[in-house]
Amino acid sequence: MINGWTGNILRINLTTGAIS
C-alpha cells in the first residue's frame, strides 16, 4: 500500500515536472 502510494506520488511529481 505504501509502496503504491509513493509510486503514485512520484508518478504525479514526474508528470508535473515534465509538463512544467
From Swiss-Prot:
Gene Ontology MF term list: 2-oxo-acid reductase activity; 4 iron, 4 sulfur cluster binding; molybdenum ion binding; molybdopterin cofactor binding
Reaction catalyzed: a (2R)-2-hydroxycarboxylate + A = a 2-oxocarboxylate + AH2
Keyword 4Fe-4S: yes
Regulation: Is inhibited by cyanide. Is sensitive to oxygen.
Swiss-Prot/TrEMBL cofactor(s): [4Fe-4S] cluster; Mo-molybdopterin
Keywords assigned: 4Fe-4S, Cell membrane, Iron, Iron-sulfur, Membrane, Metal-binding, Molybdenum, Oxidoreductase
Described function: Oxidoreductase with an extremely broad substrate specificity that can reduce reversibly 2-oxocarboxylates to (2R)-hydroxycarboxylates.
Phylogenetic lineage: Bacteria, Pseudomonadati, Pseudomonadota, Gammaproteobacteria, Enterobacterales
Subcellular localization: Cell membrane
Superkingdom of origin: Bacteria
Subunit architecture: Forms various types of homooligomers.
Cofactor binding comment, as recorded: Binds 1 [4Fe-4S] cluster per subunit.
Class in the EC hierarchy, top level: oxidoreductase
EC number: 1.1.99.30
Record-level GO cellular component terms: plasma membrane
Name listed for the protein in its UniProt record: 2-oxo-acid reductase
Family of the protein in this entry: Belongs to the AOR/FOR family.
